[in-house]
């Protein structure tokens, strides 16, 4: 399985930043609407920040669990629709003073009050879905729910401040707290049930619409987490269970001071003994939540920066990480999901080697590119294919502030490189340069699409408070407008990043151009029949662009019948343009489903072998196998059998019309039957594979057929 993402584009917008009347983004209606917007904008990816429950400081990278979801993201309107909440009680709270900022303190105080009410009205314990959910997640949910309940009982202090017996998970203490806090434990399980109950349908909806979710997981977990409390042997802790060393990084392009994250560091030697079992569980859980997993601080897998617990970043030192051994464990657990390696920072040759060996795409950030050195690896013209390119991440300046904050010398260099006329034009050209990059995938932050400055920046590394607050607004209309959507869609088409894999925008195959050339009409003025034939032309040209003679061997499937059925929608789907064509038609007041009805239904005959032969051809093309079909073109059509007055009768049944999918070739053969000679000619039909190659079905027809033998009721053999 390829680990590359393929050429595409996406938007980084945290769930927390979605519009919502309840102070923070949720998995409700606005999330689904955003998926629709991504689709219309030709995007393939929605990247989110970590979705776990946040702790003090509100950072999604410091979560109480590597497995749990953030209860803040549970949609309250959905709970209202389920009868668990009343709209008036939800609206009685003031959730925020501003639509574009999250007030985390207020959310913390009020959200759990409301969710407690929903919990009190729920009959989830009687639900088979709930029982199944608990069983499927038993490896983490019991520890997590108990951890959160005990933490709340201890005035939200972390587990190191608990009494020794429960800190060390003594069996008698565990049993006592389960009994004492049973209702609270159940509450936290209920929240996870509701989170997953809302997240999985949202992900499914995104996937159905061609959007993949890129999730972000920190390489390290928080000290204040159920993960560390329940797995102390997996971390480098002291005898008192406090961290002996903590994670961070030395001074770099993100911070001249360096960063001290405070996360405990894994005991990789211990983890290796059970083949990284905890990591496998974590990755498998993440693979259910996301289609693509971005591993933050990937370089820590090769070598990690270890800072004495009481020291500063400059006091730290590098130690060897698990490297390829952990990558192999991840690959064994990840299923069909893919990985992005966040390889930013001080990248040594060992890191570059591991990223290459893993096959994971790395990252490029344009805000690191403009130092005056044309060999800078982050400049778009130096990007390699298997990368994900960003203008900036959540840790960077907004594009507008980044450009204005550079020295005059670098601004001049930047404008020259981008061929920009002004700083504002430079921001626009930077987005074009990103899309133009050779990197397979590009991701834009929503704030940069909207032209925001640093007032909308998500995070300033090495600072506490004031981060992770920005929200997209939605009054009468979304702040992310149709104009933004149209611009992105045009960029994806222009630079071959459209959600579909073909370039429908080329002038000679653009539907509107074909209609104009063929009928001198706009799409909206064409009849359904005219649009049908225009789509035939467009589809044939698209299919022809995917014909290949690659491969030293070729399969020929010979059959008396190939019963292929209607082809228009099948070909549009296989070529990856059905949704785009549907949208173009809708914008012109037409329906793809009405156009489908114009196409005659070719006979499916009276047996199954002809249908099976057609399916074989479709499968070969979809699998990328070099193979064509050879058969007969039924000049007068097939026949169908009916019974009239207890007698069998044959009547004519339509076949493929000559002016539709059949392409006449120059290949002819003279066939001799004794003294009779007949001339045959080969006709071709494109066989499109799903997102793959185009093969051919070669059908031979006799040119000298006397069509007068066909009577209205069929052929009279008497």
For each of these PLM feature ranges, what is it?
Residues 10, 14-33, 567, 603-607:
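N-terminal catalytic cores of NTP/NDP-binding nucleotidyl/phosphoryl-transfer enzymes
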């Amino acid at each position: 399985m390829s680990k590359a993402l393929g050429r595409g584009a996406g938007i980084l917008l945290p769930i927390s930043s979605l519009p919502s009347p309840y102070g923070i983004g949720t998995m409700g209606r606005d999330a689904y609407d955003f998926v629709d917007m991504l689709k219309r904008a030709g995007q393939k990816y929605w990247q989110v920040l970590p979705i776990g429950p946040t702790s003090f400081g509100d950072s999604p990278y410091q979560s109480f669990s590597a497995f749990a979801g953030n209860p803040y993201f549970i949609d309250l309107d959905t709970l209202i629709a389920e009868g668990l909440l009343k709209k008036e009680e939800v609206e009685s709270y003031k959730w925020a003073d501003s639509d574009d900022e999250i007030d985390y303190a207020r959310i913390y105080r009020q959200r759990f009050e409301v969710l407690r009410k929903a919990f009190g009205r729920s009959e989830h314990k009687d639900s088979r879905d709930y029982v199944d959910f608990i069983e499927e997640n038993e490896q983490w949910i019991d520890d997590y729910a108990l951890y959160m309940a005990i933490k709340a009982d201890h005035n939200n202090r972390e587990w190191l401040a608990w009494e020794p017996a429960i800190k060390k998970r003594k069996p008698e203490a565990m049993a006592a707290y389960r009994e004492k806090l049973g209702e609270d434990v159940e509450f936290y399980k209920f929240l996870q049930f509701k989170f997953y109950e809302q997240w999985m349908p949202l992900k499914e909806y995104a996937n159905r619409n061609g959007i993949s979710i890129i999730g972000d997981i920190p390489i390290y977990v928080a000290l204040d987490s159920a993960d560390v409390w329940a797995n102390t042997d997996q971390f480098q802790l002291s005898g008192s269970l406090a961290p002996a060393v903590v994670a961070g990084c030395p001074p770099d392009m993100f911070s001249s001071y360096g960063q001290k994250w405070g996360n405990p560091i894994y005991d990789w030697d211990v983890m290796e003994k059970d083949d990284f079992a905890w990591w496998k569980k974590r990755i498998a859980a993440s693979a259910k939540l996301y289609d693509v997993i971005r591993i933050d601080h990937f370089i820590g897998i090769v070598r990690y920066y270890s800072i004495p617990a009481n020291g500063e970043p400059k006091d730290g030192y590098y130690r060897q990480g698990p490297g390829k051994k952990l990558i192999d464990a991840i690959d064994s657990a990840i299923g069909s999901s893919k990985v992005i390696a966040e390889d930013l920072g001080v990248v040594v040759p060992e890191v570059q080697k591991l990223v290459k060996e893993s096959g994971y795409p790395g990252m490029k950030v344009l805000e690191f590119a403009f130092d005056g050195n044309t060999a800078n690896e982050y400049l778009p013209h130096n990007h390699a294919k298997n990368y994900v390119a960003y203008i900036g991440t959540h840790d960077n300046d907004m594009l507008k502030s980044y450009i204005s904050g550079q020295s005059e010398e670098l601004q001049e260099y930047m404008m020259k490189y981008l061929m920009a006329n002004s700083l504002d034009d430079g921001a626009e050209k930077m987005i074009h340069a990103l899309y133009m990059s050779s990197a397979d995938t590009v991701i834009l932050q929503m704030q940069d699409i909207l032209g925001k400055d640093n007032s909308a920046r998500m995070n300033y590394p090495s600072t506490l408070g004031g981060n992770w607050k920005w929200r997209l607004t939605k009054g009468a209309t979304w702040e992310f407008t149709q104009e933004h959507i149209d611009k992105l869609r045009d960029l994806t088409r222009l630079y071959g990043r459209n959600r579909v894999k073909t370039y429908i925008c080329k002038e000679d195959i653009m539907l509107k151009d074909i209609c104009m050339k063929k009928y001198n009409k706009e799409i909206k003025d064409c009849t359904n029949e005219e649009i049908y034939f225009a789509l035939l032309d467009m589809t044939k040209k698209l299919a022809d662009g995917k014909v290949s003679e690659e491969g030293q061997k070729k399969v020929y499937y010979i059959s008396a019948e190939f019963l292929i059925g209607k082809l228009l929608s099948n070909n549009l789907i296989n070529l990856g343009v059905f949704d785009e064509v549907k949208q173009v038609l809708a914008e012109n007041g037409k329906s793809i489903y009405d156009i489908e009805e114009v196409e005659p239904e070719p006979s499916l005959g009276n047996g199954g072998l002809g249908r099976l032969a057609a399916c074989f051809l479709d499968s070969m093309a979809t699998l990328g196998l070099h193979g064509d079909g050879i058969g007969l073109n039924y000049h007068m059509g097939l026949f169908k059998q009916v019974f009239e007055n207890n007698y069998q009768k044959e009547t004519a049944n339509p076949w493929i019309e000559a002016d539709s999918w059949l392409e006449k070739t120059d290949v002819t053969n003279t066939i001799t039957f004794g003294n009779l000679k007949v001339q045959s000619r080969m006709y071709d039909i494109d066989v499109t594979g799903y997102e793959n190659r185009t093969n051919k079905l070669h059908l031979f027809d006799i040119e000298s057929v006397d069509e007068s033998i066909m009577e209205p009721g069929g052929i009279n053999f008497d």
